[in-house]
Amino acid sequence: MTVAEIKKLALNNQVFNEAKALLEKGNVIFPKKFLKRKKIIIEVLDGKVFKVQINLKTAAAHLDCSCSNDKQNCVHIIAALLKYNDLKNQDNKEFDLNKADKLECKEVEILIENVSLAIVNGSWKLKIGFVINIDKVQTNTTALRFYCCDNKDVYFLHTEDEQLFRIALDKFNSVERQTLLIFDQLNKTKQMQYENNSLLFNLDQFLSLVKEVKKPSLFLLNEDKTDNILFLRSQHKINGLSHVCGFLNNKVFDFVSYNEKTKQIVLRLAYLNKFTDFKFPYNINIYKLAFGETLFFHFLIHLKMNGFKNIFFQSDVVIVKESEYLPKMFLTIEFNTQKNKFITDAFFKYKNKNSNTLTTVYPHRYYLAQKTNTSNFNRLLFYEQALQRFYEELFQIDYLRRFENIPIKDKNQIALFKTVFDDYKTIDLAELKLTSNLLNYKQLHFSISDIKALKIEDRQLKIEFKAGGIDLKLIKSVLSNYYKGNAICIGEDGWYDLNDENAKALISFWSQIDLRNATCDANNNLLLAKYHLFEVVDTISKYTDVTNLLDEKTALQLKIASENQFHLSLDNNQINNLRKYQKEGVKWIRALEDNQFGGILADEMGLGKTAQVIFAMLDSYQSTKSLLPSLIIVPASLLLNWKSEFQKFAPHVKIVTANGNFKERSQVYESLKNQILLMSFNVLRSDIKWISQKKFHYVVIDEAQGIKNENSTVTKAAKKIKGNFCLALTGTPIENRLLDLWSCFDFVLPNFLGNKKQFSDQFEKEKNDESFQKLMKKTSPFILRRTKNKVLKELPKKIITDIYVELSEEHQKLYDKQKTDGLKEIKESDAKNALNILSLILKLRHICSLVKDNDVNDFEDNSKANAALNIIYEALENKRKVILFTQFLDVIDCFKQTLKNQKIDHLVFDGRKTVKNRNTIIQKFNSAKEPCVMLASLKAGGVGINLTAAEVVIHFDVWWNSAVENQATDRAHRIGQSKTVQVYRIIAKNTIEERVCQVQNQKQELVKKTLVEDVNFFKSLSHEELLKLFE
């Protein structure tokens, strides 16, 4: 406690000043040795004697005075605290011998706090931590023994000059003099240093000096400031035995004796028992070695390190060999290449009493200590733990437990293991074992000239190597460690430095090839799935001319697939109705099929993907003469569309549809031969048990974004279907996230992009240019995407216009109130849930569209609705048909009522309509002779329907995902459209709609990098990023 803190405890400044006066007069009297007491009584003279009691255990929380003042912290208490503070501050203060009267010099006890071994600059040091105990003062002494006075070296006040030191030595007895001579010699030879209240000795030098002392030497050590003082005394006796003794509670205990003739060392356990409490707690992990145990153990280690082998232990009158008393430790450190991690195994073996058998115990199982049957041996837990900690420090391992995992670091870690192993394997403390792969350093090898040939065999890509083949397991391990950031790789028979030039060359090459599902043949040639052909050829071509490695068949397959030169068996009359890009699409599909690949046809909506698939199937059946049926899975709303397309392009092909009840569907399945089976997603989900038992020629999924959720029953069902060739059709391969693309590929080319986690770690989490380019390069041979502006030069333009409107005053007030209340609720909530913010965004978008809920009668105060109605009126006057898309069904109802009141022809197309009704509505809209309006929900507009009769498209509420918005627009802007399509987006200024558009515009870069459509960025935005939308 400081003086300032004591002053705060005083009732006022007057009380504090009076207390200081009592202190300065010497009127505050403390008892002797008060520092060791938990409760002390202080006498304060103030007219009479007042007694102040301080409970040191609870500090200043319990203060009491015998004066009549009933107020706390009276002048006597403050005076006592000031005196206590002064005395405490004197602790550890330096005595200046030169300024002191020698007759009044006092002997000060050096209290040793800990004794331990340490390695300093590669040498063993004995470290003794100490404090100077002012409380133990003896008067009747003429000089200080020794004292440390700076932070670098140790000096003795007696040795300020040599003459003064010699004079001082005369004042000591022989034991004290010999002690000082030893410390002074250590100091002069720089073998002793002072660091952080510790004396640091060179252990060998220290012990050798002690041995040379002919008279008893005294070293004063103390544990935890107790009265149990240990004097280590080295003395020679006539019988030739050297002794080091312990002094405890005024009794001397023999610690160790050494017989120079027999070279026999005897450690006496009576000493150890005096300093060790053997009552171990259940939770031994928190057990701290006692002072005696620590000293005993380090002394034993030092003896062994200096070559002493003839060591015995004495208990009472029985002397036994060390091996009979101490357990043997067995320590193994290995690297398990199967689990790719270090594993340690540490245990002790005790010799059983009256037999030559051994009992094994594990040091980490402390909680079993009480249950272990120790009737046949004396278990030394302190020794187990001390030895365990000793090797933990040597190997720099946190815990030496059985099966403990140690992280891989770098070659310095391996060097440390080997150094410790070499230095300590001969010391009879433990039997050390390091597996050979930790002791052998090996170098990796890579040369492109080692590759002998590339060929396709049995639907697999084989990379043949020259003599010796390839060590695939090692290469995978090297790459795995490299990706984890490790600097080394440990194999079966040695370890490798990954920063070595050869390793860098190997990693550079093989990291470009997906080896996750690779295997080897009997000759250690590499076997990969056939679809890896393109990436392997591309990688090798960076190093050498790959054509020299390809056999004729493989080279031809590669040329046909990469240059799209597949020869169709259909004659020109059959495909004359197709456009050039569609013919290329048919060839691309057939080339994939011919090479046993799968693919994704991702042409922009309106480019005729259906026709390309139909002609590819026709060519395939004509060429292969397959007798298997083919399966086409589509949304229910597109069943009739596909059927009509077949009737249009291939009327001779028999089409069957899986509909009706299960009995009717099962009859279709049973009679199925080489027909085309059309099936909806819902039927697939219900009938997958039967479907999965059939084998199909083609398996096609239209609107394949329907299987983007890998956990849905439809997706799982689709991936159970067996087909010779699988094809996915989608205009939006990436609708919400990159995983949508993975799910499609997992259907057409299982394992091509790894599993979900592997794909996410490699591509989705990284989201950088390098990972995007790698993904594009890998997938480009198996995904075909064309856009209308590239392949349909004759297609009329699509003109997009954003119309910004300001909400009316009342409308804006309603919006602002909802926004303020919603944000307040979110910010006051403890949970950072993005769904709460998305829910608020949805509410605000809805308010932008409607002034109030269910306002079905009046659009007069709704500026957005009025803007849309003005566009509708103008379009109808110009004889143009209109589609208005919205997300909200109640908005559709409002427009429906308004148009009805205006007696304007209109149709409604949304999810509330049956599939049959939807097709009728589409036909009615397209065939209507007079201009009319279709009110459609946005999602209903995104499932393959054809609305080319429309010339004006209105998006009433901006959709988060512009890909869905574009998909709806392209129902009008597609093949068959002969007029310019005008697209309007109605956006409310100063609202969330405006912010959504801004964010979408900023994020368009990702679309370009990932080859395909837009991404719903809102699903990937953090809580904080979503809140920024409201700024």
UniProtKB/Swiss-Prot annotation:
GO terms for biological process: positive regulation of transcription by RNA polymerase II. InterPro entries: Helicase_ATP-bd, Helicase_C-like, P-loop_NTPase, SNF2-like_sf, SNF2/RAD54-like_C, SNF2_N, Znf_SWIM. It holds the Pfam family SNF2-rel_dom. It comes from Mycoplasma genitalium (strain ATCC 33530 / DSM 19775 / NCTC 10195 / G37). The keyword Zinc applies. Residues 868-1022 form the Helicase C-terminal domain. GO terms for molecular function: ATP binding; chromatin binding; DNA binding; helicase activity; hydrolase activity; nucleosome array spacer activity; zinc ion binding. A zinc finger (SWIM-type) spans 50-85. A motif (DEAQ box) lies at residues 702-705. Disruption phenotype: Not essential, it can be deleted. Belongs to the SNF2/RAD54 helicase family. Keywords: ATP-binding, Helicase, Hydrolase, Metal-binding, Nucleotide-binding, Zinc, Zinc-finger. ATP binds at residues 603-610. Residues 590-751 form the Helicase ATP-binding domain. This is Uncharacterized ATP-dependent helicase MG018. Its EC number is 3.6.4.-.
